[in-house]
Amino acid sequence: MCKLNIFDPVQNYENLNQQLNLRRNKLNNLRKQGKTFTNNFKRNVISNQLFLQYGEKNNETLKTLNIQVSLAGRMINRRIMGKASFVILQDSGGTIQLYLSSKNLSDSFYNEHFKKWDLGDILGVHGRLFKTKTGELTINCNEIILLTKALRPIPNKFHGIVDKQIRYRQRYLDLITNKNSFNLFKTRSQIITEIRQFLNKEDFIEVETPILQSLPGGATARPFITYHNALDMNLYLRIAPELYLKQLIIGGFEKIFEINRNFRNEGLSAHHNPEFTMMELYIAYADYHDVMLLTQNLLNTITNHVLGTNIIQYGNLKLDFSKNFVKMTMKEAICHYNKQILSKHLDDKMQAITCAKNIGIHIDQKWGLGRIQTEIFEKTTEKHLLQPTFITSYPIEVSPLARRNDNNPFFADRFELFIGGYEIGNGFSELNDYEDQANRLIEQATIKNSGDNESMFYDEDYIIALEHGLPPTAGLGIGIDRLVMLLTNSHFIRDVILFPTMRLKI
């Protein structure tokens, strides 16, 4: 069936204007009667609670129980049949049918008021529960009140909103007309709640760190810049909370986490939005192996508690969170998925450059061997990491805040978690050698001064904090939006962010 959209600017402009004029006239009449925007209606139930409690009972039982309810919501459909009507009312719990008759409401109210209301109006009802001959749970209304007059019509709920631009820009319409979208965002909330509950049970403390920062740090990314008038200085929207969180570990907290927004002045894609939600945690007296185990247990718990299963569908994949996650080093993964690349090729810079050029990677002369390995991995290997997989042994060159590996200082004690072919999390044993950290930040600042906008600033305050002593610590960051995409079988990040970043309408 062909789907239509009543907000199509070409086909429906004239019709929309007519509806607006009609509804505005109705609103003006209501204003004259003093019957607009009532604010004293009290409900005692929402729709899904009624179905849970009374959905299995027959009509005779409901008559005996004489269940009186007060409920409010949006009128999304109605059938007027002479002196009786059926209305579908929608609230946060779902939908329920109303039965209205001139016998219960009086002829004058039914004809002069109710019949003139419109789809989209918000109503409050008092009435008795019963079941129709077809067995549908229904409220027989003895009073119905117009709470809010809707000036603009809602999209046809049967056809829904096809235009994704409208879904993203006017999310409220998407939520009204698309039950799946409404439930997706409820699931998102449940996922975040479950993360908090899991970490609370593990004795973590939730903290808050600055979003406006004098220097952005904690990740390699281009920041957003703003200006503080009173202080006469530039400030940056944070790209990561990491450096502040580690200062709290220095201050004596031993298990902390933060769930908040990060901002990166970068491109948009199916998996990237400039404003996104991140969970970061830090544990004193732990290493990256401990954090990998915690990550696995966290995701196992989330899938089980929120979705009711550890095996979930994502596109054509069945992702299994019940087993131990796969572990591979970056080099092992590259060689496994690129049979023409041998481990020895990745150990020699010239051979690694040849491998990179053969697969279309443009080599920057400033890159070292570690960066070249990482570029090869990102271009050829990430997309194959479908089941939950920890990739370890990242080069120190691309890990400026991570601890060097004791056995091979070329590598960092770091991992990234990949699921469905995309990075979901990043963790490592934290670098607490202040001299090593200072040297790496100096190197990052030098790269930044040469024109790389994504490299880090040198943060003297953080180095001073490190000099007071950071205990052995490990950390983890998980992108909440990408995690929600996986767990709701969504393939575009804009589908899981209520109000995604959009280009200005022309």
Swiss-Prot record:
Pfam families: tRNA-synt_2, tRNA_anti-codon. GO terms for molecular function: ATP binding; lysine-tRNA ligase activity; magnesium ion binding; tRNA binding. One of its GO terms (cellular component) is cytosol. Mg(2+) 1 binds at residues 416, 423. Mg(2+) 2 binds at residue 423. It is found in: Cytoplasm. This is Lysine--tRNA ligase. It comes from Baumannia cicadellinicola subsp. Homalodisca coagulata. The gene is lysS.
